[in-house]
Amino acid sequence: MTTIVSVRRNGHVVIAGDGQATLGNTVMKGNVKKVRRLYNDKVIAGFAGGTADAFTLFELFERKLEMHQGHLVKAAVELAKDWRTDRMLRKLEALLAVADENASLIITGNGDVVQPENDLIAIGSGGPYAQAAARALLENTDMGARDIAEKALDIAGDICIYTNHFHTIEELPSKA
């Protein structure tokens, strides 16, 4: 699978992801970019799960952002509704972590839109490791959001066999 982590701290929000794509137990590619900017660079998003499914979801989410003039929560709820009710979309297997200057959200195929505690998101196979590392760093250091996300990904990459050390990182200024 993968690891995606999002951290919000001191006026910055970051989403970072590794680059490993696997097919079964074989590494197919090591430099996949699973994090990208959407909606005129005002939203950042990362995915965990099937690559083709995730790109479909990115496209659908960007359409929802355009329909709702960039309102992250409304776009996320509308995507989750469609994802839950549309037969074709229900077959897509991916999770999205999305953020703008105000909010960080997880969007799931079950129709869930979750705003996590402490604006910390970690999804994918290495998510629990990245979340534990990022939480410890948030609570015990003065490190910035980008440094925390990078270190959390490094730790997840050392532990999770489906996570590598090729990182893609996107960052936005944050009001939250």
Swiss-Prot record:
Keyword flag Phosphoprotein: no
Gene3D superfamilies found in the cross-reference section: Glutamine Phosphoribosylpyrophosphate, subunit 1, domain 1
GO cellular component, one term: proteasome core complex
Catalytic activity line of the entry: ATP-dependent cleavage of peptide bonds with broad specificity
UniProt keyword Cytoplasm present: yes
Positions with a binding annotation for Na(+): G157, C160, T163
Localization in the cell: Cytoplasm
Purpose: Protease subunit of a proteasome-like degradation complex believed to be a general protein degrading machinery.
Name this polypeptide is given: ATP-dependent protease subunit HslV
